[in-house]
A protein has these predicted regions:
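Catalytic "initiation/cleavage/transfer" segments centered on a nucleophilic residue
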Residues: 57-86, 95-97, 170-204
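Conserved His + Asp/Glu catalytic blocks
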Residues: 106, 125-130, 136-141, 147-204
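Signature for HUH/AEP ssDNA processing cores
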Residues: 62-138
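Phenylalanine-focused residue identity feature
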Residues: 34, 88-91, 96, 147, ...
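Histidine (H) residue identity feature
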Residues: 6, 12, 35, 81, ...
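DNA replication initiation on ssDNA origins
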Residues: 1-78, 86
Length: 204
Protein backbone atom coordinates (compact mmCIF):
# COMPACT_ATOMS: atom_id res chain seq x y z
CA UNK A 1 0.00 0.00 0.00
CA UNK A 2 1.28 3.48 -0.89
CA UNK A 3 0.51 6.25 1.57
CA UNK A 4 0.64 9.64 -0.13
CA UNK A 5 0.78 12.70 2.09
CA UNK A 6 0.77 16.13 0.48
CA UNK A 7 3.76 18.24 1.44
CA UNK A 8 2.91 20.97 3.98
CA UNK A 9 -0.53 19.49 4.56
CA UNK A 10 -1.46 18.63 8.13
CA UNK A 11 -5.20 18.22 7.69
CA UNK A 12 -5.46 14.86 5.95
CA UNK A 13 -3.75 11.95 4.26
CA UNK A 14 -4.66 10.31 0.96
CA UNK A 15 -4.17 6.56 0.76
CA UNK A 16 -3.74 5.00 -2.67
CA UNK A 17 -4.36 1.27 -2.89
CA UNK A 18 -5.24 -0.27 -6.25
CA UNK A 19 -7.86 2.18 -7.59
CA UNK A 20 -8.93 3.67 -4.27
CA UNK A 21 -8.77 7.20 -2.95
CA UNK A 22 -9.43 7.58 0.76
CA UNK A 23 -9.65 11.09 2.12
CA UNK A 24 -9.65 11.77 5.86
CA UNK A 25 -10.86 15.24 6.77
CA UNK A 26 -9.83 17.20 9.86
CA UNK A 27 -12.82 15.77 11.75
CA UNK A 28 -11.60 12.21 10.97
CA UNK A 29 -14.48 11.60 8.55
CA UNK A 30 -13.47 9.37 5.64
CA UNK A 31 -14.63 9.37 2.04
CA UNK A 32 -13.70 6.53 -0.29
CA UNK A 33 -13.83 6.79 -4.07
CA UNK A 34 -13.10 3.82 -6.34
CA UNK A 35 -12.04 4.53 -9.91
CA UNK A 36 -9.93 3.04 -12.69
CA UNK A 37 -7.76 6.10 -13.38
CA UNK A 38 -4.22 6.69 -12.17
CA UNK A 39 -4.81 10.25 -11.01
CA UNK A 40 -7.74 12.14 -9.59
CA UNK A 41 -6.71 15.69 -10.45
CA UNK A 42 -6.74 18.08 -7.54
CA UNK A 43 -8.23 15.55 -5.15
CA UNK A 44 -7.50 16.44 -1.55
CA UNK A 45 -5.20 19.38 -2.21
CA UNK A 46 -5.60 21.85 0.63
CA UNK A 47 -3.63 24.69 2.12
CA UNK A 48 -1.61 24.11 5.26
CA UNK A 49 -3.38 24.74 8.53
CA UNK A 50 -1.60 25.78 11.71
CA UNK A 51 -2.14 22.84 14.07
CA UNK A 52 -1.54 25.11 17.09
CA UNK A 53 -4.66 27.13 16.34
CA UNK A 54 -7.85 25.59 17.69
CA UNK A 55 -10.57 25.47 15.04
CA UNK A 56 -14.12 26.33 16.06
CA UNK A 57 -17.01 24.04 15.20
CA UNK A 58 -18.32 26.68 12.81
CA UNK A 59 -14.98 26.83 11.00
CA UNK A 60 -14.74 23.04 10.97
CA UNK A 61 -18.17 22.80 9.34
CA UNK A 62 -17.22 25.47 6.81
CA UNK A 63 -14.09 23.49 5.91
CA UNK A 64 -16.11 20.28 5.62
CA UNK A 65 -18.54 21.89 3.18
CA UNK A 66 -15.67 23.39 1.18
CA UNK A 67 -13.92 20.01 0.97
CA UNK A 68 -17.16 18.29 0.02
CA UNK A 69 -17.80 20.78 -2.79
CA UNK A 70 -14.24 20.33 -4.11
CA UNK A 71 -14.59 16.55 -4.05
CA UNK A 72 -17.90 16.70 -5.92
CA UNK A 73 -16.43 18.94 -8.61
CA UNK A 74 -13.47 16.59 -9.04
CA UNK A 75 -15.82 13.65 -9.48
CA UNK A 76 -17.85 15.59 -12.05
CA UNK A 77 -14.64 16.34 -13.99
CA UNK A 78 -13.38 12.77 -13.70
CA UNK A 79 -16.59 11.27 -15.07
CA UNK A 80 -17.26 13.93 -17.70
CA UNK A 81 -13.79 14.13 -19.27
CA UNK A 82 -13.29 10.36 -19.30
CA UNK A 83 -16.59 9.96 -21.09
CA UNK A 84 -15.86 12.34 -23.98
CA UNK A 85 -13.94 10.03 -26.33
CA UNK A 86 -15.49 6.81 -25.13
CA UNK A 87 -18.92 7.33 -23.53
CA UNK A 88 -19.94 5.67 -20.30
CA UNK A 89 -22.36 2.80 -20.82
CA UNK A 90 -24.09 2.08 -17.52
CA UNK A 91 -25.22 3.84 -14.37
CA UNK A 92 -25.19 1.36 -11.50
CA UNK A 93 -26.51 1.23 -7.94
CA UNK A 94 -25.25 -1.57 -5.69
CA UNK A 95 -26.75 -2.35 -2.29
CA UNK A 96 -25.96 -5.07 0.24
CA UNK A 97 -27.99 -7.94 1.62
CA UNK A 98 -27.44 -7.77 5.43
CA UNK A 99 -27.08 -11.54 5.41
CA UNK A 100 -24.09 -11.24 3.07
CA UNK A 101 -22.38 -7.98 4.10
CA UNK A 102 -22.82 -5.80 7.18
CA UNK A 103 -23.54 -2.53 5.41
CA UNK A 104 -23.54 -0.68 8.75
CA UNK A 105 -19.78 -1.29 8.97
CA UNK A 106 -18.05 1.11 6.57
CA UNK A 107 -14.76 -0.80 6.53
CA UNK A 108 -16.53 -4.09 5.76
CA UNK A 109 -18.43 -2.45 2.90
CA UNK A 110 -15.25 -0.96 1.40
CA UNK A 111 -13.48 -4.33 1.60
CA UNK A 112 -16.40 -6.10 -0.11
CA UNK A 113 -16.60 -3.48 -2.86
CA UNK A 114 -12.86 -3.63 -3.50
CA UNK A 115 -13.06 -7.42 -3.80
CA UNK A 116 -15.96 -7.21 -6.25
CA UNK A 117 -14.25 -4.56 -8.39
CA UNK A 118 -11.04 -6.61 -8.52
CA UNK A 119 -13.07 -9.61 -9.68
CA UNK A 120 -14.85 -7.56 -12.35
CA UNK A 121 -11.53 -6.19 -13.62
CA UNK A 122 -10.24 -9.74 -13.93
CA UNK A 123 -13.30 -10.71 -15.99
CA UNK A 124 -13.30 -7.45 -17.99
CA UNK A 125 -9.65 -6.31 -18.41
CA UNK A 126 -10.58 -3.06 -20.19
CA UNK A 127 -13.20 -2.03 -17.64
CA UNK A 128 -13.38 1.63 -16.63
CA UNK A 129 -15.43 2.86 -13.69
CA UNK A 130 -16.01 5.48 -11.03
CA UNK A 131 -17.84 4.43 -7.84
CA UNK A 132 -18.93 6.61 -4.91
CA UNK A 133 -20.57 5.61 -1.61
CA UNK A 134 -23.82 6.96 -0.21
CA UNK A 135 -24.69 6.79 3.47
CA UNK A 136 -28.41 6.15 3.94
CA UNK A 137 -30.34 7.66 6.85
CA UNK A 138 -30.49 4.15 8.32
CA UNK A 139 -26.69 4.16 8.58
CA UNK A 140 -26.26 1.61 5.79
CA UNK A 141 -23.90 2.25 2.89
CA UNK A 142 -24.57 1.57 -0.76
CA UNK A 143 -22.76 2.56 -3.95
CA UNK A 144 -23.47 4.45 -7.17
CA UNK A 145 -21.25 4.66 -10.22
CA UNK A 146 -20.62 4.52 -13.93
CA UNK A 147 -19.03 1.74 -15.98
CA UNK A 148 -17.92 0.99 -19.52
CA UNK A 149 -16.13 -1.82 -21.36
CA UNK A 150 -17.81 -4.64 -19.45
CA UNK A 151 -18.49 -7.28 -22.16
CA UNK A 152 -18.74 -10.09 -19.61
CA UNK A 153 -21.44 -8.52 -17.49
CA UNK A 154 -24.62 -10.57 -17.37
CA UNK A 155 -27.55 -8.17 -17.39
CA UNK A 156 -31.15 -9.34 -17.13
CA UNK A 157 -34.27 -7.22 -17.45
CA UNK A 158 -35.63 -6.24 -14.05
CA UNK A 159 -39.19 -7.38 -13.40
CA UNK A 160 -41.80 -7.05 -10.67
CA UNK A 161 -42.85 -10.20 -8.77
CA UNK A 162 -45.76 -10.35 -11.19
CA UNK A 163 -43.43 -10.41 -14.19
CA UNK A 164 -43.94 -6.86 -15.41
CA UNK A 165 -40.87 -5.12 -16.81
CA UNK A 166 -39.49 -2.36 -14.58
CA UNK A 167 -38.78 0.92 -16.34
CA UNK A 168 -37.78 4.39 -15.17
CA UNK A 169 -38.51 7.43 -17.33
CA UNK A 170 -39.25 5.00 -20.14
CA UNK A 171 -35.89 3.23 -19.87
CA UNK A 172 -35.55 -0.45 -19.04
CA UNK A 173 -33.92 -1.23 -15.69
CA UNK A 174 -31.58 -4.23 -15.48
CA UNK A 175 -30.18 -6.43 -12.73
CA UNK A 176 -26.53 -7.47 -12.71
CA UNK A 177 -26.19 -11.18 -11.89
CA UNK A 178 -22.39 -10.84 -11.56
CA UNK A 179 -23.00 -9.11 -8.22
CA UNK A 180 -23.58 -11.57 -5.37
CA UNK A 181 -23.55 -9.30 -2.31
CA UNK A 182 -27.08 -8.00 -2.60
CA UNK A 183 -29.21 -6.01 -5.00
CA UNK A 184 -28.52 -4.08 -8.18
CA UNK A 185 -30.13 -1.62 -10.54
CA UNK A 186 -28.48 -0.86 -13.87
CA UNK A 187 -29.59 1.56 -16.58
CA UNK A 188 -28.06 2.58 -19.90
CA UNK A 189 -26.67 6.12 -19.82
CA UNK A 190 -28.40 8.56 -22.16
CA UNK A 191 -26.71 11.85 -21.20
CA UNK A 192 -22.97 11.86 -20.47
CA UNK A 193 -22.89 15.33 -18.92
CA UNK A 194 -25.92 14.80 -16.72
CA UNK A 195 -24.67 11.51 -15.29
CA UNK A 196 -21.46 13.09 -13.97
CA UNK A 197 -23.49 15.52 -11.87
CA UNK A 198 -25.94 12.77 -10.90
CA UNK A 199 -23.22 10.55 -9.43
CA UNK A 200 -21.58 13.42 -7.52
CA UNK A 201 -24.81 14.34 -5.72
CA UNK A 202 -24.62 11.11 -3.72
CA UNK A 203 -21.40 12.22 -2.02
CA UNK A 204 -22.52 13.59 1.35
Amino acid sequence: MDVLKHKNDTTHTIVAEYNTRIKTYANKEKKVIFHSYSNLKGYGQEKKKNSLIEITEEERERQRKKNLYRTKMNIVDLIYHNGLKEPWQYFVTLTFNPGEVDSLDYDVVVKAMRKWIDNMQHQNPGMSYVMTPELHKSGRVHWHGVFKNVPNWNLVQARTPGGRLIKKNGLQIYNLTNYKYGYTTVSEIQNQEAVSVYVSKYIT
